[in-house]
Amino acid sequence: MARYDRAITVFSPDGHLFQVEYAMEAVRKGNAAVGVRGTDTVVLGVEKKSTPKLQDSRSVRKIVNLDDHIALACAGLKADARVLVNKARIECQSHRLTVEDPVTVEYITRYIAGLQQKYTQSGGVRPFGLSTLIIGFDPHTGVPSLYQTDPSGTFSAWKANATGRNSNSTREFLEKNYKETSGQETVKLAIRALLEVVESGGKNIEVAVMTKEHGLKQLEEAEIDAIVAEIEAEKAAAEAAKRPHRRNLVELKFVLNYP
């Protein structure tokens, strides 16, 4: 097995490319990332580690612009992300200069996925150890989009999705709670999904909101804290509403069982 373990371009007898699977494992151990598409808004949210007092927090952003109308978040190896983001930005600008038109979200997603796939079958390189969530608005139709790519080079479109740490449980939460929303409700859903895996609340969450009119806006920590407080208040109100109902059920059972 060791031969197939080391070789990037050699399949194992049972059809595995182990280096690609190891890259996917790096994604599963990376920070949690969530993307949610609304009717007029697309939101990216990522888990972030608390920065030291002397570090400039702007230098460790995990959500970046590829173009004015496209943004990307990722889970996995950050150094790999920097290389991939730089290549994608160059492609966006090259396309704009060549055809005098901005790229579509699908076009740049195909480009990124193609790069990731190329690095699974080339000698002297290794697969990118990251999965990306790409959001944006079509420059011609104005329709919002959300795509995901993975280390194998696969890409797909989503209404809402998660990657990184505990992505399965986060995706299950999104499946249960997703509905077509707009504006602030889309932002709240993304933050609620992240709070399923981020224990320390809003201070360890980075959120960016994209609209067609204003492009990408990174939310300040105070704005995130306000939304988290609103979500917690809604949870407390829902729990309080359930308690009288439970008490009534207990009383009803007591009456029915009373001799």
From Swiss-Prot:
GO terms for biological process: proteasome-mediated ubiquitin-dependent protein catabolic process. PROSITE patterns: PROTEASOME_ALPHA_1, PROTEASOME_ALPHA_2. It is found in: Cytoplasm; Nucleus. Keywords: Cytoplasm, Nucleus, Proteasome. One of its GO terms (cellular component) is nucleus. InterPro entries: Ntn_hydrolases_N, Proteasome_alpha, Proteasome_alpha-type, Proteasome_asu_N, Proteasome_sua/b. Its main location: cytoplasm. Pfam families: Proteasome, Proteasome_A_N. Belongs to the peptidase T1A family. The 26S proteasome consists of a 20S proteasome core and two 19S regulatory subunits. The 20S proteasome core is composed of 28 subunits that are arranged in four stacked rings, resulting in a barrel-shaped structure. The two end rings are each formed by seven alpha subunits, and the two central rings are each formed by seven beta subunits. The catalytic chamber with the active sites is on the inside of the barrel. The proteasome is a multicatalytic proteinase complex which is characterized by its ability to cleave peptides with Arg, Phe, Tyr, Leu, and Glu adjacent to the leaving group at neutral or slightly basic pH. The proteasome has an ATP-dependent proteolytic activity. PANTHER family: PROTEASOME SUBUNIT ALPHA/BETA. This is Proteasome subunit alpha type-7. It comes from Solanum lycopersicum (Tomato). The lineage of its organism: Eukaryota, Viridiplantae, Streptophyta, Embryophyta, Tracheophyta.
